[in-house]
Each structure stands twice: as structure tokens, then as C-alpha cells.
Amino acid sequence: SIFATMRTLAEQSREIDMLTLKEELSKRAQLDQVGGAGYISSLADGIPDVANVERYARIVKEKSMLRRLIVMGNTVMRAALDAPHEPAEVLNIAEQTLYKIAEGSIDKGFVQLDRITRKNMEAIEALQHAGKLITGIPTGYDRFDEFTSGFQSQDLVILAARPSMGKTSFMMNIAEAIAIPTREGGPRAPSQRLYSVGVFSLEMSKEQIGLRMLSSESGVSNHLIRAGMLSERNWRDLAEASTRLAKAKIYVDDTPGIDVMELRAKARRLKMEVGLDMVMVDYLQLMAVKGRVESRNQEISQISRGLKGVAKELNLPLISLSQLSRRPEQRTGDHRPQLADLRESGSIEQDADLVAFIYRDEVYNKDTEEKGIAEIIIAKQRNGPIGDFKLVFRNDITKFFNYEPSPDFVPE
């Protein structure tokens, strides 16, 4: 009761001393319950030297951490002794609990609304003073950032398209934009710093990912690289690109058929070891589910829900690619994808904070006037507008560029 009353006074920005504490306890008819005015006065006699308050607080924090480690040890021991638990599951429990302790986070349960809104107002005020249009991690594309203000922490972002639209290329181009330094060694505008990205590639090998990034970053055609038909200029461009890529904090895991639990454990470990700002998955439908599941829909639901959980636990945006059903091909006239086309489960739409489709008309219409043009269709955004915008796509180097609506625009 005494501490709760002191906390109330602090939340009301009122002074905390013996007089105000006694007065507030009297108003609540709790003064006698806590020992009376004499006990409150005696508490002041036991106050240690305030000059060492930081050291005292550190001791309390350290003891709290040790107690939590003891509790964690008991929890892991019980899980290990419980027959139904698989070793990998026990390891995941241990890592998850240890991560929370290391990050200083605990499961607080219910939080009163006034504390939530006060924190909201502080965040809004900070954004107002910062005066930035991008409050999350930049996408590398101006119009995308205008719609989203960047990728936000704890968001599950789904990038979906039919085959050959450039899903993997678009995802990796975003990684390149935020993680690879410029020739001068700094971040690319509008990024304020270089970010670290963890990529789970279930479709392509890490070597294939590396070749694509070399082509995209150097501007040297994929075909020329694979055929070994490189000029002296090509070699120079590739060498420069390789130097920049070597400085990027992009980590690729190409384990096939990974499940959510293993992905979470690897991402958590990477964040603890080197830091992690974003996770990317290529792609959702290739992930595995442990145990028996009644239907494919339930499998996908379990995966999408798990990916959202990873984003929340690690407090970062998670970008996942997703396949679409064949419905766009079956529609006559307009083949642009819709939310109903998300393959095998409506839960992807429900779990995602943002769903964006990639559409290139030239894939369906060879005579289109929009050759080399891609549309990014933001079909769902939980905390922002929906709409679409255009990008330029160069298939020879699998790279997307900002779209400039001038007839003589050529990507650099």
C-alpha cells in the first residue's frame, strides 16, 4: 500500500515526502493499516546515503536478474524432465527466457490505459520534435516510404506476387538499400545509419542470393556473370560492389524447410550476438510445421501467426514473401492481384500489418506500353493508407528503381 501510494503520487507529478504520503494514505483510510504515522516517520530514519542511490539501484537490478535466472533454471529443468517436450523445444524455452532477461523485458500482464496513453503521447511528442517523415526503417523507395513512413517495429509485412514478378529481387533490393554502404562508406539516403538484416532464404541458396546481389549492386548483367563473359569494366564494377557487400551486415540462412520455432531461435541468437534490425523470409509457403496439422490452411495459419509472434518478440519488422493463387491468371482483363488471392489461407491477411503486391503487366501482356514498369499495390495497411505506385524494374540485373515519370528516364 505504501509503495502503491507513492507510485500514484509520482504518476500525478506530486512531491513524495512524509507529509504528502501520510496525507494520501489518510485520504485512502489506509494509514493505520500500514502502521500509522509513526511507522511512516521511522522509514525516513532508515534511508541510506542518497549519494549512492545509483549503486543501490544497480544492486537491486542485479539481484532481480539473478532471481529471474534461478526461476528460468527451474523452468527449463521441469521442461526437460517432462517427457512430451522435444529437446529443441526445451532449448527454445531456455533461449527465449534468457533473451527476455538479457533484454530486460518481463511479462507484465495488464497495464492500465493511462500509462499506455502517456507513453503514446511521449512517443508522438518525440516524433513531432524530430520532424521526420520516416519513423521506421526506410524501404529504399520514396513512394513506399510516403505510404508507410518506413517499416515499423513489431510489424509483419507481406510482399506477395505471382512467379516471375520479382518478389525475391524486391526484398533483397530493400536489404541492399538499408544495409550496404555507399562508395563513401556511409548509409544511403534517407537512412540515418546502416541496418543489420537477417535473411532466411528457403527457395534460393546463399550462393544464388550472393550472385544476385553482386549483379544488382554492380549493374553487371546476371547473364554475363553466369556465362563468364566479363569485360575489364565489368570486373572493376564487380570488385567495387564486392567490397561494399563485404561491409554490409546482411546474414543469410538457407536452411530448407525451416519451421517458425527454429527461425525464432536463430533470429534471437543473431540479435543477441551481432544485433538485428530486420528479418526477411523467402518465402512463407516453404516453411515447415512440426506435428500433425489437419489441413494446409491450418499450416499456413500457424506459420503466419508464428511470424507475427517473432516480430513482436524481437521488436523488429519482419518481411515475408508469399505466393499467390492462380486466380489473377484466371481473371479476364485485369490481372492485378487482390487480397483474396493470398494463397491457401485468409489468416495471412489477418496476421499481416501490411500487405503489398508486386505486379508487372509485361508478364501477361507482351505488347504493353509499360515495359520495365512494376506496380506496388498496398492492399492492406493496419496503421496507414492503401494505394499503389510505380517502380522501374531492370530484369537483367534484377533491380527495382524509383520511378521518374519522364520519357528519357534511365536507371543508373
Question: Predicted regions span which residues?
Answer:
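Noncatalytic partner-interaction/assembly domains of nucleic-acid and motor enzyme complexes
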Residues: S1-S64
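C-terminal regions of RecA-like/P-loop NTPase motor modules
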Residues: I225, D259-L276, R305-N315, R327-E412
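Helical hairpin unit composed of two closely spaced alpha helices linked by a short loop
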Residues: L276-S320
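The conserved Walker
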Residues: P163
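Cytosolic-facing regulatory segments adjacent to core modules
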Residues: E146, A177, P181-G275, V289, ...
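Interdomain "pre-motor" coupling segment immediately N-terminal to P-loop NTPase/helicase cores
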Residues: D45-T117
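Pre-Walker A segment
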Residues: E89, K100-D155
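Conserved lysine of the Walker
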Residues: K167
